[in-house]
Amino acid sequence: MIEIKNLKFKYNQDQTSYTLNDVSFHVKHGEWLSIVGHNGSGKSTTARLIGGLLVADSGQIIVDGQELTEETVWDIRDKIGMVFQNPDNQFVGATVEDDVAFGLENKGLPYKEMVSRVQEALSFVGMMDFKDREPARLSGGQKQRVAIAGIIAMRPSILILDEATSMLDPEGRQELIQYIEDIRQQYGMTVLSITHDLDEVAMSNRVLVLKQGKVESISSPRELFSRGSELVDLGLDIPFSALLTQKLKNQGLIDCEGYLTEKELVEQLWEYLSKM
């Protein structure tokens, strides 16, 4: 679905090093790939290059078999929906309903189909009761849900999230992550998320780590979380379940190898307690 080959980019020619330096990776159709790393590692730059908002110095970006060029950029943008950290910058409609319908109006969809898509999208993210509200009067989590509804209505094949959950409280963050997974499952969207959030990373199929503009590793979330204290050097926290698992192992209370999810850790503890 997305193939990146030997991508190089710098914001100005005075930079002594590239923001992205020979980056290559791929994202399969229907996959959720998270990109993580320290601030300045090139995560958001990668998202903007794929979305055609920036132009690479060299390398190739291929989306759905089509190489991104000046001639194809608008075709490729039609296949991609992007949600940023601050959704206020994306709102254009006077009401929630108007905002979700905006992109469909620009595409010239028949009125009945447009109404149907808007209602379906708002219902999917639980915002139908807010359709007549001004977007500015919504909470942060509600604003992000409206932004995602606008993308659902457009039916792109790729959803790019650029720190979309970073401004939300823990409950709102968890709700949004679940909505994204539901969208991926129901609509078959490919998801690319730029994030520091461990819950978001845990939901993904694979995780790409960028370090100083280069690909440091590509692995499953489980493999990444098993790296323990190395995660701090990569701009991530150590998952609570990993810290607790290590302490329990040190005390001889559980016997396991590698990272355990919270669910797996609970199962291990129940097994231990049942033997007491």
Curated annotation (Swiss-Prot):
Effect on the protein upon substituting E163Q: 10-fold decrease in ATPase and riboflavin uptake
Stored SUPFAM superfamilies: P-loop containing nucleoside triphosphate hydrolases
Domain ABC transporter: start-end pairs: 2-237
SMART domains according to UniProt: AAA
Subcellular compartments: Cell membrane
NCBIfam families: ECF_ATPase_1, PRK13635.1, PRK13648.1
Self-association state and partner proteins as the record states: Forms a stable energy-coupling factor (ECF) transporter complex composed of 2 membrane-embedded substrate-binding proteins (S component), 2 ATP-binding proteins (A component) and 2 transmembrane proteins (T component) upon coexpression of the components in E.coli. May be able to interact with more than 1 S component at a time.
Record-given protein name: Energy-coupling factor transporter ATP-binding protein EcfA1
Organism: Streptococcus thermophilus (strain ATCC BAA-250 / LMG 18311)
